[in-house]
Regions:
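Multi-pass membrane catalytic core of lipid/isoprenoid biosynthesis enzymes
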Residues: 1-22, 114-148
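Intramembrane alpha-helical segments
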Residues: 1-77
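Hydrophobic alpha-helical transmembrane segments of polytopic
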Residues: 2, 27-34, 85, 129-132, ...
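Transmembrane alpha-helical segments that form the membrane-embedded catalytic/substrate-channel core
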Residues: 32-45, 64, 68-69, 87-102, ...
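Functional transmembrane core segments of multi-pass inner-membrane proteins
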Residues: 57-105, 123-126
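Hydrophobic alpha-helical transmembrane segments in multi-pass integral membrane proteins
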Residues: 65-77, 138, 186-198
Length: 198
């Protein structure tokens, strides 16, 4: 209420912001919603991160809201193709969480933390992980311009290499090694996309 009141007073004081007050309030509500979602992910009486909804939250907040929100903030509109990039990044970020959850299946079940990986079990969680990887690669392939073939190759090789190591060893040590490897792959991917846009 206090933030809304301050924004309203600011909009009244500066006439050029008057038309944008609805947009400002929308951003404030989005930020408050994101903060509440971050808090209730592992806190509160029924944390949704431990009920199997964490992957969906990561897809939504790190993919759709992160990418589309940034585009709208800078451009003032949403490009239809941006949904593919947002979904691709959301899937890759969900893969990071899934790796962590696959590694922790036994301890999560003992602590009654029923993540999606814990609910699925390791073999099905690996299959789910593979589907996310392949769908993300298809989204990147469809989204990237034809002249950016090196990015398609990078994403394809990174995905296949990652899945090879996921299935090559069945120890938790492998999952522990794959977590930072895939996190750095996602970071490198975002850096390459940024360089492409500069």
């Amino acid at each position: 209420v206090l933030c809304s009141s301050c924004l309203y007073l600011l909009a009244q004081a500066l006439p050029n912001l008057n038309a944008a007050v609805g947009t400002w309030l929308g951003w404030v509500l989005l930020v408050v919603g994101c903060l509440a979602a971050a808090f209730y992910y592992t806190a509160g009486s029924r944390p949704y991160g431990y009920r199997g909804w964490g992957d969906g939250a990561v897809f939504l907040f790190f993919g759709l809201i992160g990418v589309l929100g940034t585009e709208y903030l800078h451009a003032g509109l949403l490009n239809q193709d941006s949904w593919m990039a947002a979904a691709g990044l959301g899937l890759w970020c969900s893969m990071v969480l899934n790796l962590n959850n696959m590694r922790d299946i036994e301890s999560d079940l003992a602590a009654e933390k029923y993540t999606l990986a814990a609910r699925l079990g390791l073999p099905c969680a690996k299959a789910y992980h593979s589907l996310m990887a392949l769908f993300a690669w298809l989204l990147w392939w469809a989204w990237l311009p034809l002249g950016q073939g090196y990015l398609i190759i990078f994403s394809g090789v990174a995905t296949m290499w990652h899945l090879y190591w996921l299935y090559s060893d069945h120890t938790l040590f492998t999952l522990d090694k794959l977590l930072p490897q895939w996190s750095l792959t996602v970071l490198a991917w975002v850096a390459l996309l940024w360089l492409m846009c500069v």
